[in-house]
Regions:
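C-terminal regions of mature proteins
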Residues: 68, 72-146
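Non-catalytic beta-strand/loop surface segments
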Residues: 1-46, 106-127, 146
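M16/insulysin-pitrilysin zinc metalloprotease superfamily fold
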Residues: 22-79
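Bulky hydrophobic/aromatic packing residues
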Residues: 11, 51-53, 104
Length: 146
């Protein structure tokens, strides 16, 4: 929802970056990224707008089905045999169990607009107090010296 519904349009399409997204790790860490981004300063401001985007989008009362299906698709992608082996290796190394996978799927399928809206405030705190790292040419990151 955030990566393709908001960041892609604001940072990739309008801002000209080659790519962008948001990721939430199982330990609760949240990070946003862009790459080959000609306007890093704008992208940082866009990341700060994620809570408002969520609030506005979810207030429209749209069905959650497409969002849930898209999320399941990212957690259970179609894979060839080599991809299955790679995924199982990663799960083994991370200690991810079948019970973990089932729990995550239940949480995804049980997602509601209200539950997503509750994430807006922690994301707002992240945007206001989070750390960032910018790697680029001297001109691309000159705004950091302001």
């Amino acid at each position: 929802l955030v990566s393709y519904g908001y960041l892609w349009n604001m940072i990739r399409v309008q801002g000209g970056a080659y790519g962008t997204g948001m990721n939430v790790r199982s330990n609760g860490d949240v990070f946003c990224y862009s790459y080959r981004d000609p306007n890093v300063e704008n992208s940082l401001a866009v990341y700060g707008g994620i809570p408002d985007f969520l609030a506005e989008f979810l207030s429209q009362g749209m069905p959650m089905d497409d969002i849930i299906i898209g999320t399941v698709n990212t957690t259970e992608p179609l894979l060839d045999p080599a991809g299955v082996c790679e995924l199982e290796c990663i799960r083994y190394l991370k200690g991810t169990t079948a019970a973990d996978i089932s729990r995550i799927r239940r949480e995804i399928l049980g997602t509601t607009a209200e539950k997503l809206l509750k994430l807006a405030e922690p994301l707002r705190a992240y945007a206001e107090n989070g750390k960032f790292c910018a790697v680029g040419s001297k001109n691309a990151v000159a705004f950091l010296n302001k």
